């Protein structure tokens, strides 16, 4: 995986466009986006909707890329050249979460949509519906880690027919409504030694979806703690699988 720092990191950040979404309901949220390297007229391209972890919160509109070196992973896996993908990533303010739940809880019921999720959905919808963007609405993917792993489960349970595939990393969802997720391709990841968010959260969701008739994928990495995203970043199989999915 590409490790970026100093000048190389800033050069990569500068390839993303920064924006602010002003919600019709009040308030705003920062987000960044990037286009595929090669755009051809009258052709559509996939989009990755990325949800950062707690370390990416703030107001600089860069933390969502620097958190867990996601920006390095996107570069290493050649999202913009090999996969010719769009990426859009919102930034949660310092005192908010993607999902308003206790990360240490054994389970939870899906709460009211958070301010950050609501506004980032609005920004995403506007981006997709903008005529100048060539987004393939049948190839919109979602991925998130830790706090963003919770956000990924939350997003697909709110919009089960919207995404073509999902990769929740060390998060947790509402297993009581797992039946909503039987049709969407999901590959969840967790470290079996995670002391921040129990691997049982991912395991329980995987089992609940299977009991409801779905066929999700789940990887539990032995000996890995909370930073299981490192395994995701380097998994060629995961990225190949993700970009092969279509709604």
Question: What do these predicted regions represent?
Answer:
Residues 6-47, 85, 116, 123, ...:
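A domain-start/cap signature at the N-terminus of enzymes
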Residues 38-43, 98-146:
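Gly/Ser-rich "nucleophile elbow"/oxyanion-hole loop immediately N-terminal to the catalytic nucleophile
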Residues 51-53, 190:
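The conserved beta1-alpha1 loop
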Residues 83-85, 181-186:
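Short, proline-enriched alpha-helix->beta-strand connector loops that line the catalytic pocket
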Residues 129-182:
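Primarily recognizes the serine-hydrolase "nucleophile elbow" in alpha/beta-hydrolase
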């Amino acid at each position: 995986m590409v490790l970026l720092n100093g000048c190389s990191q800033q050069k990569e950040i500068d390839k993303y466009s920064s924006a602010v979404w002003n919600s019709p309901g009040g308030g705003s949220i920062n987000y960044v986006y990037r286009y595929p390297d090669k755009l051809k007229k009258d052709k559509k391209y996939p989009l990755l909707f990325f949800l950062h972890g707690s370390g990416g919160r703030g107001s600089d509109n860069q933390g969502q890329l620097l958190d867990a070196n996601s920006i390095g992973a996107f570069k290493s896996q050649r999202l913009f050249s090999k996969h010719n993908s769009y990426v859009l990533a919102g930034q949660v303010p310092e005192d908010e979460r993607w999902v308003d739940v206790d990360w240490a809880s054994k389970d939870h019921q899906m709460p009211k949509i958070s301010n950050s999720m609501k506004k980032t959905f609005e920004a995403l919808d506007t981006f997709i519906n903008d005529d100048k963007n060539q987004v393939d609405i049948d190839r919109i993917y979602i991925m998130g880690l830790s706090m963003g792993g919770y956000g990924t489960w939350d997003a697909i349970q709110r919009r089960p027919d919207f995404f073509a595939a999902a990769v929740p990393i060390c998060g947790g969802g509402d297993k009581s409504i797992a039946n909503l997720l039987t049709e969407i391709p999901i590959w969840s990841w967790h470290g079996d030694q995670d002391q921040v968010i129990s691997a049982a959260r991912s395991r329980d969701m995987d089992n609940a979806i299977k009991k409801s008739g779905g066929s999700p994928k789940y990887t539990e990495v032995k000996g890995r703690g909370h930073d299981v995203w490192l395994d995701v970043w380097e998994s060629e199989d995961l990225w190949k699988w993700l970009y092969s999915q279509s709604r």
